[in-house]
Amino acid sequence: MKSKQEIVPNVTIAIPVYNVERYVEKALLSALEQDFQLPYEILVIDDCGNDNSMEIVRKLQSEHPQGNIIRIIRHERNKGLGEARNTSIREARGKYLLFLDSDDWLNKEALSILYKAAIEHDAEITIGSTLKVYEGSDKTETFVYPETFISKPSAGIELNVFRGITPLVSYWNKLFLLDFIKKSDMYCVHRIMEDVIPDFKAKVLSHKVVTIPDITLYYNERGGSIMDTLWVNDTKCQQTIDTTVDIIKRIKRMIQEDYYNIDGIYDIYFANLMRYFFLYEQLGVTQEQYPQVMEIEQNCMSFIPSLRYIHGRNARIMYLLLHRREHDRSDFFKAYRFASSRLGRMLKLLISL
């Protein structure tokens, strides 16, 4: 008879830890106190911070009644969230893998809800709904998805482009079949915006995707998080620009080499472009940084063969507005600002009537 330690877990919850002593206890307790009745493990990735985060983890490991399901993997040096995700993929023992960031927390029934849906549909990706909590205020925001099951090639594109269900670009709050992640080579390649390339591959390569309306994750929107510090100084701004340029190059190359004939692929590409144009607006890109930004601007619209390759009505309008101005740098950003403005949204509404 196998001992408890030898039992293969059904699910691995992976939690990266780096300088989160204010938050990690709540995150870890939410993982420890799941009502899930099958074996699962909690994999903590110690990314070599300099606060008391890991002391809190080790205390829970030794004192909590469920503490023996915690397993700690320590990096030899700080490697960033992307590599912490990769370590989780390599080290996970569960059939399914759920990422939990160390400043968020799970609904007590999250594993039960996600696992049940995954098993019922033999899904590669099972996506729960999210409640975003704004730290220090009563403000909340919900991201609730209808109950949906898609079984077809590139199921993630079908979900996003043709069903209009657009889960957040993230690894968290999604229960993944671990074999699917490995076979699809969904490893992170960047320190920031690390989930974008794996998310792109997930959309393209998935065959069975489930979304459920139940809130399974509480996402903590806090000051000082990685996303909030992307543009705090010139160095961070430059790092962000470098990363976005590389992401777009990688996505273009994957489309050109392997995915050019997939219906809806250019919608996914275009959505990423729009995300980065918005980011550049937030960054306040300087004249010195424009040459790199132009690597995305230059010919970015012409990479899309024609308007008929874009399916969403709003995306088609944005494409038309930007395509006419792509060779004029100043007009290009003016067009983006206009298309994103309230006036632009009003025009979209009028056109849709």
Where in this protein do the model-derived segments appear?
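Donor-binding/catalytic cores of nucleotide-activated saccharide
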Residues: 102-212, 219-236
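Short aromatic/hydrophobic "clamp" motif used to bind/position activated sugar donors
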Residues: 97
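Short beta-strand/loop segment that forms part of the nucleotide-sugar
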Residues: 39-48, 71-75, 102
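Glycine-rich, basic loop-to-helix element that forms the pyrophosphate-binding segment
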Residues: 75-92, 113
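A conserved acidic beta->alpha catalytic loop
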Residues: 30, 46-56, 77
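Cell-envelope/extracellular polymer assembly enzymes that use nucleotide-activated donors
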Residues: 9-12, 30, 41, 197
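Short, well-formed alpha-helical segments that are part of the catalytic scaffolds
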Residues: 20-33, 40
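Membrane-interface aromatic/basic loop that binds lipid-linked glycans or pyrophosphate carriers
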Residues: 281-353
